[in-house]
Amino acid sequence: MSNHMLVERVLKLIKPIVDNLNFELYHLEFKREGNNNYLRIFIDKEEGNISLEDCEAVSRAVSDILDREDPIRDPYYLEVSSPGIERTLYTHEHLKRYIGFNVIVNIQGLLKGKKKYQGKLLSFDESVLRVSCEGEEIVIPKSKISTVNLKDDL
């Protein structure tokens, strides 16, 4: 089973549980690092920060169905956490939520001689992101973007 198919299968199993606990399933990934497999669940909520207790509650709740349905044949470690302050913005919903916030856009290759742009996220559509960098609007083709992360302004 491909990694994408595995993530989709796990997503279908755990999303209703995470939703029922009043958390947002922000992101889900399955990765091999060294000799170990990791299923990482990133949760968020509308108000306040994610606590250790929140992560424990989600971990306990999803462990039951993962053990019962057994979608992952190989041994793995389950990790549940917040997406963090400088979270990656994966989806259109994530981008929409953080319009007006400072972001770091990492570029594949170079764009106007740079590998990275930092500035305020102005807007986006299907093909480009618009970021205000030092007073100049930069239009970045999505095809050139490696990652977009929130910038910690603290």
Curated annotation (Swiss-Prot):
Places the protein is found: Cytoplasm
Keywords attached to this entry: Cytoplasm, Ribosome biogenesis
InterPro entries for this protein: Ribosome_maturation_RimP (IPR003728), RimP_C (IPR028998), RimP_C_sf (IPR036847), RimP_N (IPR028989), RimP_N_sf (IPR035956)
Name of one Pfam family that matches: DUF150_C
Sequence intervals crossing the membrane: none
Alphabetical GO biological process terms: ribosomal small subunit assembly; translation
One GO CC term on file: cytosol
NCBIfam families: PRK00092.3-1
Purpose: Required for maturation of 30S ribosomal subunits.
Family stated for the protein in its record: Belongs to the RimP family.
Protein name listed in UniProt: Ribosome maturation factor RimP
